[in-house]
């Protein structure tokens, strides 16, 4: 390995202005860490320089550093910025070897897709599954509801509202990893307990709600199973199954940790519950994960991102 090179020296070669605070982040040890970085704080530059420092000091090759962010545009820009500056360091003799300077920077969803493509067969998921959009998901839900014949299923809303409720329930249950069978079992136990109670308005309302919940779960499960049968996945399916795979097949985490020595997570405040389940199952056992985020800039709350995500980082990724 070449002589150690500091973050300040790297900044000088690449023409980047760097603060003492940024230097501390760039040169942090290989342990889990969360960085609170507000707008205009230079977090992207800091992440890029972190990669340069790791590579130049021999901690990891570019291909062994995984970077995740939310948009393809941000991923592409960060990837090119890092490659360009790695080339600068190599031309200055600060990086030895002839290995590729390409760093795997991608979106969270792209990474989930990679997990399914590589390991999906372990869950019976077609590795060549077609990724479908919201319009197709809506059409499939409408078709299943039209063909659903059950005298006990009475929904007093419009058909459009029924579809929206079904898709909303399906999305939320996958986002939070809810076991539909467990909910059905619990609901049925409550129904069995109150079955002998006298018929009163409140009791009848509870019975109706529980029966409707059971039917909604059954339809939701049918909808998801139908997509899998067709070799199709929605974006929510993709993340749900990637998280499920990571949690249930320990070998997947072992292989991913061997592949990526260091993980960088951008815009961590916007990660959803299913994304966190996937990431903690893969890299949550003391692996060098650095998350960068600003709790005051969360914009994806509607996707399942939670305010406490950054606060919970030490519990999700213990050192």
Residue ranges and their predicted role:
Residues 1-123, 226, 254, 308:
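P-loop NTPase Walker
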Residues 2-10, 14-15, 43, 52-53, ...:
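Conserved RecA-like helicase ATPase core segment
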Residues 26-27, 243, 280, 311:
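A cross-family signal for key residues in well-ordered alpha-helices
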Residues 35, 256, 263-264, 290-291:
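Hydrophobic positions in the central parallel beta-sheet of the AAA+
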Residues 44, 134, 159, 209-216, ...:
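Generic alpha-helical segment signature
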Residues 98-102, 120-217, 228, 260:
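ATP-hydrolysis module of ASCE/P-loop NTPase motor domains
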Residues 109-112, 212-262, 272-278:
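Conserved helicase/translocase P-loop NTPase motor core
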Residues 267:
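Catalytic glutamate of the conserved HExxH
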